[in-house]
Amino acid sequence: MKNSSILFVLIIVVFLISSSGNKKMVGEAKKCDQTWTCEGEDKCREKCLTLHNGVGVCDLYTAPLVPKQCFCHYDC
């Protein structure tokens, strides 16, 4: 009896932990992104904030002959 109750509690705890990460709040904004050629870290941040009220970051590493890109992440 004791073993079955411990097993039952363990199963409930595992279920609660695994399902808690899948919940999405009602009305939560969808995440969108947009890219353009990076003209500098400051300009990237400023343009993203102005256009989309988001966060802009330039590439850290790029392939040769490929221009750096500004990645703008914002709520749709």
From Swiss-Prot:
GO CC terms of this entry: extracellular region
Secreted among keywords: yes
InterPro entries in the cross-refs: DEFL
Keywords: Antimicrobial, Disulfide bond, Fungicide, Plant defense, Secreted, Signal
Superkingdom of origin: Eukaryota
Location, primary (coarse class): secreted
Location relative to the cell: Secreted
Any single GO BP term: defense response to fungus
Keyword ATP-binding tagged: no
Pfam families, sorted: AtDEF-like
Leader sequence residues: 1-21
Record-annotated disulphide pairs: 32-76, 38-58, 44-70, 48-72
Annotated family: Belongs to the DEFL family.
Family annotation (PANTHER family): DEFENSIN-LIKE PROTEIN 184-RELATED
Protein name: Putative defensin-like protein 184
Naturally occurring in which organism (per UniProt): Arabidopsis thaliana (Mouse-ear cress)
Gene: LCR18
